[in-house]
Amino acid sequence: MKSPASVIAIALLAASAAFAQTAPTIGQGPGYHDPRSPFKPLEERSDIVSWKLLSQVTAKAEKKKIVPTFPAAVQALDRKTVKVQGFMMPLEAGDKQQHFLLSSVPTTCSFCVPAGPEGLVEVRTRKPVRYTLEPVVVEGQLAVLNDDPYGLYYRVEDGNAVN
């Protein structure tokens, strides 16, 4: 007969293995939107660049820094006008923002795993956008960043909030 401690250890090991299969490592990948989240996950739309596409980037270490390698489909979007959607991460205080990040997962969800740089887009808009916990769609010129000093992979410039 197994001791209660060994049964608990086996149960904890099985639970941690199950969790490891469903959630990525924090700060890597497109993030994980847990089904327990009070926020609906982003819907795939044909008129919006997919996070599945943007997250196909790989990274490698070169000379003490991480360098992204983008697939051809992502590189083809560089300097093109696109729509992206995500959850706002304000970079400054205030109800309205002109410089913020969009995340593939809600940043206020305690059940969700944050994304790495492939799950974030830096956004600069012409007109201020009201902060919201709901998903935001922005249209603007996408820059695919090969050597950003902040480690970002994507930036939308000259953007506008759209539906």
Residue ranges and their predicted role:
Residues M1-I8:
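Bacterial N-terminal signal peptides that target proteins for export
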Residues A11-L12:
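Repetitive helical segments and hydrophobic/amphipathic motifs
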Residues A15-A18:
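N-terminal signal peptide c-region/cleavage motif recognized by signal peptidases
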Residues A20-N163:
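OB-fold and OB-like single-stranded nucleic-acid-recognition modules
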